[in-house]
UniProtKB/Swiss-Prot annotation:
Annotated Polar residues bias: 329-345
Protein species of origin: Xylella fastidiosa (strain 9a5c)
Subunit structure: Monomer.
Summary of the function given for this chain in its UniProt record: Catalyzes the attachment of valine to tRNA(Val). As ValRS can inadvertently accommodate and process structurally similar amino acids such as threonine, to avoid such errors, it has a 'posttransfer' editing activity that hydrolyzes mischarged Thr-tRNA(Val) in a tRNA-dependent manner.
Residues bound to ATP: K588
Any one Pfam family match given in the protein's UniProt record, by short name: Val_tRNA-synt_C
Listed name of the protein: Valine--tRNA ligase
GO CC, one annotated term: cytosol
Matches recorded under HAMAP family: Val_tRNA_synth_type1
Length: 994
């Protein structure tokens, strides 16, 4: 047993305890019991722990620790993601910063990848070290990196199988394109930002001198304009893509333009004739009701182009500059099947069958950046009298989350997965309950995405990642296989056939979707047996955020179903998004990010300011952020310890969409830990000579571990606390099952702070100080027993302090086990219902009595050592019985000189008064306080009780409440009103005597 310090200092034991747990192998699966598995959403290997990580990992760890204590065979599968784009950016920047004159491109693919592995070896485990500081009890020996050989083999296998099943194809499609990284990116990597822009109106002349009668009507249908026009006025926010227009579009029921559908207009600056088409996509009320259609540069236009079989003209290159020439591609969707003879190897070849003409761009525009091209095109339009108007307009601008650059819809050859069949099965699994969402409303989000799914672009133009297992010959034929050797053998390709592997890699989500089973050895049977594939799949629960329900959760369900015939997990617990105390999203640019390690270990103000202002994408914000930080944290952030942060997270974990993190809550829960520490010191000091360590005081538990003897209570206070302990134990199990960590934390907090620390410790003092040695011994044992049980109840949420305290308490109960984390989680005890219920009711009455009299003492500023007299008036037999029964406790707890009863008609001296039910409590004021002050106190109390009566009357006069609330609740409210009314009458009567 280590030395027990007098004050709570988490720095003195948290790191020590974690190292001991890990060294002893306590985090590893036991191999016995019911399997309980949790998958950690693998954080980026480039990353550091942020509040979102800390939030989810705390809840996961609580579940794992709880189920481990329940005897389950727990596996928390952890690992990191190779994070293709993020890692490539970090290492590319580092290569330049090393100052050797090297760049990513100068190193070449192999040299650069070697640099990435070097970097990963040096700093790739940062986030796992930080997770340990939080208390994550994962089996680190099974930590997996998505680029490790086993998961890499799984990626190749999955790609080949899907390709052979006809689910993967290569085709020309529109994708999100980052012109800085020069790669396709996923929707999740695109942030739509509201920005101020312009809406330009451009005149598109009708072909061949055609004119039409343009008529406008107001909302009532009255004609307000009629004129002959020879052009259509098109509204657009992107004039730089005008060169790629292949139609203009109106709503088919817009009376202004219906006669023009099927006609053509002359595309400005080009002389090309493009059709006027009708499509219900158009909003007739937006702009002029006429929009340009540029299928190669807008996602909505792309779909419209497919519907109307419009040509597609790509006018921007991969750097978002105007091309010098381009091909007109037909409006047929491009994409090869799994036939290994017809999939081309590059964008030019992939659409060869769909090309029928070549366009040369205006020479003065070729090579211009898109924004320079916009400026020039607008100038050209204005010079030709075709620019009608430009008005300010707020629009959603898609920006890459890595580079901050505006993302371009870009037509390029990529690899895709056909999703329709996979999605139908994935949706059916959830609909029939094979996978359950918590809270259940998130199934609607899942359903919406699955019912509106598009084929998935899985290729990325990067070097770091899983290289696509496809090889091209010189004729553009593609061959997919697990290796080049397999490809050559399967297709009888001799050495004279030159094969070149695809340069692209698979997007990170492709490997992440295999996480539930690739981490368990799939597809290698030997590895599967070693990793417990059959035992640990499906996992029990996935804890994740709502923002990746589609990108990760849905894909895991689909992939696991297809490749294993199983579901990846039974439950999906969706957490909210952590925001700051004002409800704002935490972001570097806002300067409101909180680092969980700074909350745990503390940080000086200067270091905090430096952390928040370094590396800003907008350096001009630094001064504002520094000023706000100094105002909010004038002393920096004090260390709170891991437990205080964890308990804060649990308490905040509602089932809502957004969660406001307030550092003040962490301070409050640090105080809670301190309260628990001091209560334990009290118990230990008062049980130092106890005999609880003798063999008679403990018994063998059902699991073979030593278990403390169940108390045989000799006092009402013991019976009360044991009944409350049983109730709180049952509630803890229920809240864990419901993933209601907030209600769990609240219940345990109330029990620990109010019922155990504040009340039972106080109520135990009379017995501990009495001459009744049996009652004293029983109380000491119950103190230890309840405290030890409470520490076990709290352990999943606050593992460090509970372990440290338990190691002091356990020996007093004769427990031989060496660690709390492997002790059984408490189970509700079977109590003698009637006896315990009666004792509990009596103690609740005693608590009210003590509280009422302490309020009087506090209000009157009576010194704690000053003894007072208590006069009682009332005719309830139960009150007289309780007063007699608890006389010793009342004298001890309230510093009473004596207790006397007054007759109903007896005149009482001037007294401070309180009412408990029908019992009137009077503390004579003579020599105690100023009578005027007592009048003020009574007036205040009368107002308080009147307010409570108003609340009850309000409820009972509400027909909806009376009709819909359970009868017991309504009756309880009526009883409460009666009690308040009785109290008010007594208070007014007493006030009248002063």
């Amino acid at each position: 047993m280590s030395q027990f310090t007098s004050s709570y200092d988490p720095t003195s034991f948290e790191a020590r305890l974690y190292a001991a747990w890990e060294a002893a192998g306590h985090f590893k699966p036991s191999g016995t019991g019911q399997p309980y598995t949790i998958l950690l959403p693998p954080p980026n290997v480039t990353g550091t722990l942020h509040m979102g990580h800390a939030f989810q990992q705390t809840l996961m760890d609580a579940l794992v620790r709880y189920h481990r204590m329940c005897g389950d065979d727990t596996l928390w599968q952890v690992g990191t993601d190779h994070a293709g784009i993020a890692t490539e950016m970090v290492v590319s920047r580092n290569v330049v910063l090393e100052g050797h004159g090297e760049t990513r491109d100068s190193l070449g693919r192999d040299g650069f990848i070697n640099k990435v592995w070097e970097w990963k070896q040096q700093s790739g485990d940062t986030i796992e070290r930080q997770m340990r500081r939080l208390g994550v009890s994962a089996d680190w020996s099974r930590s997996t990196f998505t680029m490790d050989p086993q998961p890499s083999a799984a990626v190749t296998e999955a790609f080949v199988r899907w390709y052979e099943a006809g689910l993967i194809y290569r085709g020309q499609r529109l994708v999100n394109w980052d012109p800085v990284l020069k790669t396709a990116i996923s929707d999740l990597e695109v942030e739509n930002v509201a920005e101020e822009g312009m809406l330009w109106s451009i005149r598109y002349p009708l072909s061949d001198g055609v004119t039409y009668e343009h008529v406008e009507h107001d909302a009532a249908g009255n004609e307000i304009l009629r004129e002959t026009r020879d052009s259509l006025i098109v509204a657009t926010t992107r004039p730089e893509t005008l060169l790629g227009d292949t139609a203009v579009m109106v709503h088919p029921e817009d009376r202004r333009y219906t006669a023009l559908i099927g006609k053509t207009v002359t595309l400005p600056l080009t002389g090309r004739h493009i059709p006027v088409i009708g499509d219900a996509y158009v909003d007739p009320t937006f702009g002029t009701g006429v929009v340009k259609v540029t299928p190669a540069h807008d996602f909505n236009d792309y779909q419209i182009g497919l519907r109307h079989r419009l040509p597609m003209i790509q006018v921007l290159d991969d750097a978002a500059c105007i091309v010098s020439k381009t091909s007109i591609q037909s409006g047929m969707p491009s994409g090869a099947t799994s036939d290994t003879t017809n999939t081309p190897s590059d964008p030019e070849a992939s659409s060869a069958a769909n090309q029928h003409d070549t366009l040369v761009m205006p020479a003065h525009l070729a090579g211009l950046d898109r924004y320079a091209a916009r400026k020039q095109i607008l100038a050209d339009l204005d010079a030709q009298g075709l620019l009608v108007a430009a008005i300010p307009h707020t629009l959603q601008v898609p920006r890459g989350d890595r580079t901050g650059q505006v993302i371009e819809p870009y037509l390029t050859a990529q690899w895709f997965v056909k999703m329709e069949t996979l999605a139908a099965r994935g949706l059916a699994l959830v609909e029939r309950g094979a996978v359950t969402f918590v809270p259940p409303n998130w199934i609607n989000t899942y359903r919406h995405w699955m019912e509106n799914i598009q084929d998935w672009c899985i290729s990325r133009q990067l070097w770091w990642g899983h290289r696509i297992p496809a090889w091209f010959d010189t004729q553009g034929g593609v061959y997919v296989g697990r290796s080049e050797a397999e490809v050559r053998a399967k297709h009888a390709l001799g050495p004279e056939v030159t094969l070149t592997q695809d340069n692209d890699v698979l997007e990170t989500w492709f490997s992440s979707q295999l996480w539930p089973f690739s981490t368990l050895g799939w597809p290698d049977p030997t590895a599967m047996a070693e990793h417990g594939y059959a035992r640990y799949l499906p996992s029990s629960v996935l804890v994740t955020g709502f923002d990746i329900i589609f990108f990760w959760v849905a894909r895991m369900i689909m992939a696991t179903d297809h490749f294993t015939g199983n579901v990846p997990f039974h439950d999906v617990y969706i957490t909210g998004l952590i925001r700051d105390a004002q409800g704002q999203k935490m972001s570097k640019s806002k300067g409101n990010v909180l680092d969980p390690l700074d909350i745990i270990d503390g940080i000086t103000l200067d270091d905090l300011v430096a952390k928040r202002t370094t590396g800003l994408m907008q350096p001009k914000l630094a001064e504002k952020i520094a000023k706000a930080t100094r105002k909010e944290f004038p002393e920096g952030i004090a260390p709170h310890g891991a437990d205080a942060l964890r308990f804060t997270i649990a308490a905040l974990a509602t089932h809502g969409r957004d969660i406001k993190f307030d550092l003040g809550r962490a301070e409050g829960y640090k105080n809670f830990c301190n309260k628990l520490w001091n209560a334990t010191r009290f118990v230990l000091m008062n049980t130092a000579d106890d005999t609880a360590h003798s063999p008679a005081q403990h018994q063998a538990g059902q699991d073979g571990q030593d278990a403390p003897r169940t108390p045989q209570p000799r006092t009402d206070a013991e019976q009360w606390i044991l009944s409350r302990l049983t109730a709180i134990t049952a509630e803890a199990h229920a809240q864990f099952a419901a993933y209601r960590f907030d209600l769990l934390a609240q219940a345990l907090y109330e029990f620990a702070w109010n019922e155990f620390c504040d009340w039972f410790v106080e109520l135990a003092k009379p017995a501990l100080n009495s001459d009744d040695t049996q009652a004293a011994a029983s109380t000491r044992h119950t103190l230890l027993y309840v405290l030890e049980t409470l520490l076990r109840l709290l352990h999943p949420l606050i593992p460090f302090i509970t372990e440290e305290l338990w190691r002091q308490v356990a020996p007093r109960l004769g427990i031989q086990a060496t660690t709390l984390m492997l002790r059984p989680y408490p189970q509700p005890q079977q109590l003698e219902t009637a006896a315990f219920a009666n004792a509990a009711a009596d103690v609740e009455w005693l608590k009210i009595m003590v509280s009422a009299l302490r309020r009087i003492r506090s209000t009157l500023n009576v010194p704690p050592s000053r003894r007072v007299s208590l006069l009682l008036q009332g005719d309830q037999e139960v009150d007289r019985r309780r007063i007699t029964h608890f006389a010793t406790a009342l004298h001890f707890l309230l510093k009473l000189e004596h207790i006397d009863w007054l007759g109903a008609d007896s005149a009482a001296p001037p007294s401070a008064t309180a009412i408990v039910g029908t019992l009137k409590l009077l503390v004579p004021l003579e020599g105690l306080i100023d009578v005027d002050a007592e009048r003020v106190r009574l007036d205040k109390e009368i107002k308080r009780v009147e307010s409570e009566i108003d609340k009850s009357n309000g409820k009972l006069s509400n027909a909806v409440f009376v009709q819909n609330a359970p009868a017991a609740v309504v009756e309880q409210e009526r009883s409460r009103l009666t009690e308040w009314t009785t109290q008010l009458n007594g208070l007014r009567e007493r006030r009248a005597t002063l």
